[in-house]
Amino acid sequence: MRHYYLLALIGVLLLPLSLSAQTIVDGVLSGCMSLSGRYVVPDEVTKIDNFAFFSSSVTEVVIGKNVREISNSAFQNCMNLEHVTFATGSKLERIGDDVFSDCPKLTEIALPEGLQRMGVRTFWRNESLKQVSLPTTLDTLPKYCFQSCTALRKMSLPEGMKVIAENAFAGCENLMQVKLSSTIDSIATKAFYKNLGLLTLTIPEGVRSIADSAFMRCENLETVTLPASLERVGAKLFRRCPELTAISVASGGKHFISRDGILYSADLKTLYEAPAKFKSEDYKVPAETETIYHYAFYECPEVQGITIPQTIKRIGVAALVNNGMRQFTFPGNDKYWLANGSLYYKATTNDGEQTVFMAHPSGAEGEAIVTYGTSFVSDYALAGCHKISSLRLPSTLLGMGAFVLSDCKELKDIYSYAIEPPVLTEESFMGLNLPSVQLHVYPEAMQKYMNAPYWQLILHGDDLTGEEPRAIESPELQTTQLSWSYQHDGTLHLESLSAATMEVALYSTDGVRLATLELAPHATAQITLPTAGVYLLRSTSALTSSVERVML
């Protein structure tokens, strides 16, 4: 009996709350979470409050004509909501974040003219949404607006729309047709991420900017045409688009062209991106090219080799990795060079110049060697090297970047000659099958590696013995313009075989320039060496350039 009175008392106390749960104060509607069925928002309402209908059981809502704002999460997680309509003459101006997100039964909606702003994730994860009408007064499609709307098959963006924001259509896996308006100015990062239904794509004139990875993982996309109006692009617009055969550019553009199906700047100075299905046994980068952009040949399995001009000034991260390249051909210059078949560059830091291991040919087999004198291994440097079985790291190595050994399927052994473990990031070994890899270090370094962040993830062995190999293989180049000989008095004698004046520079294997001189046509000269050892001799003239190893 006492329990009955207690329950009755609770009911009496809660009754006023239930009766007053739905409230309208100063035109703001709130507390509708207990509603179900059809609901018409009264004309006196000018604003629907945050979470007003959150997780309610309403099935249909008519938004009154005087509502100017629908606030954050107002209808979020309404699992039974099927229909939303707006009264004739709607004055709606603003929609907040997550307003209609996670409404799995909502199939269609027509937003009224006059709407000026939508918040992020407006229709996020509405798996039944098939038809959407947007007003011409809306100039920005917000971040994550239609993300994971998997039933959406076609979309038409109205005139007046200017910006497609980050991840706006990400995960719309069945989106097959997108009509972009002529007023679109920019397309943001991953705007069309994983749109598996897209087969062809033509970006309309007027678009000036497309950010990196805008069409990433459009895995069935075969052809794409970019507009002549395009002025700026990010890195790897079409990353992980394995069926893409060519990137075309409409004629008349001032900033971009397509050459061999590859996206270039109009003056050929920058190579931006090759499509995944681009084929070449040895692609020769144009002599005019000064920059190879980040990820330019990433995931291009049918490119077997590349020849890079000596005039290159910049090569971006992951530009030459995770593809089918078995070798790089490159004469080298003051900033970039090849050694042991791998690409290196000289970086300027607060501690001075540092040698960075940048890329190893993905199709190369056997052992990969990071040469003595190298300070850092770049992000993705050996990504996709499926056939390397071992890796040697020098005692001079200070650190390694992210995804360095991603997808190195046959890697079994890593030999590190550094007593102090090189610094790793949490992503350095990402994508590597760690249980199958053995780390070999000197006995005195064993405990340090076992305690070092991320090194402890690898099986350890203290079986490294002997001295670290410091000899360095130079690029396979024919030096026909310079003859040299070494005398026991420590002098290196040089003789020019060229008809042009050349610059001759001598380097240590860790990249330090020891001597530089100018050699006239067919002249002789000499350099006094500090000690016997291994050196790099670089000669450069207007006719040719070469690098070779000198062992004294």
Feature-to-residue mapping (PLM):
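Positively charged n-region of N-terminal signal peptides that target proteins for export
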Residues: 1-5, 552
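Structural signature of tandem-repeat unit edges
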Residues: 22-23, 33-47, 56-69, 79-94, ...
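Consensus positions within tandem repeat domains that build extended binding/scaffold surfaces
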Residues: 50-52, 72-74, 96-99, 119-122, ...
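A structural signal for leucine-rich repeat
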Residues: 427-432
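A recurrent domain-boundary module in secreted/ectodomain proteins
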Residues: 450-471
